[in-house]
Amino acid sequence: MIQANTVITGDSLTVLRDMEADSVDMVITDPPYGIDYQSGRKEKASRLAKIANDKTPFIWWIYDAARVVKRGGVLCFTRWDVQQVFIDALRLAGLTVKSVIVWDKKAHGMGDLKGSFAPRYEAIIFATKGRYELPGKRPDDLIACAKVGNQSLIHPNEKPVELLEQLIEATTTPGALILDPFAGSGSTLVAAAKTGRQ
């Protein structure tokens, strides 16, 4: 049994496989997207390492996430070009995809500066195990929340604590056990503690 308020270091696939079934209330995570990203900006690239294991859509964790989550759900960050891969994997794992939430970052991000539109959103797939009812008022599927500023980043694709707080409060009740198999900068852990979750 996993202890509340615990950080486990190790390979996420191995740790998930070793966890008990139906042991967490919600999985909220930002897995590698499979885009092999590293910033082209010299000052950012020199501070932040390339994202590990980010060459192909990393979906294998989803099957064990579906196994360990109770009658709750999974919130999975993704981006437009690999979104369908994650949706298909969530469905194959037996989860029901309920929504794709759009996170408006309020400023554009990485990408081809001259050959594509400036990306200013990320998608968050919300999938559930069994019949699951949101605990409060029905939230919108659009969340506007400023991204973490470049000078404050400690991870190349860091998520703001405020955004994670909104997601946690919309999908769980105080005391819920949250699992983030790809903790990155630890934003999910901080948001869980700030909202009275474990």
Predicted regions and their residues:
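Core catalytic lobe of class I
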Residues: M1-Q198
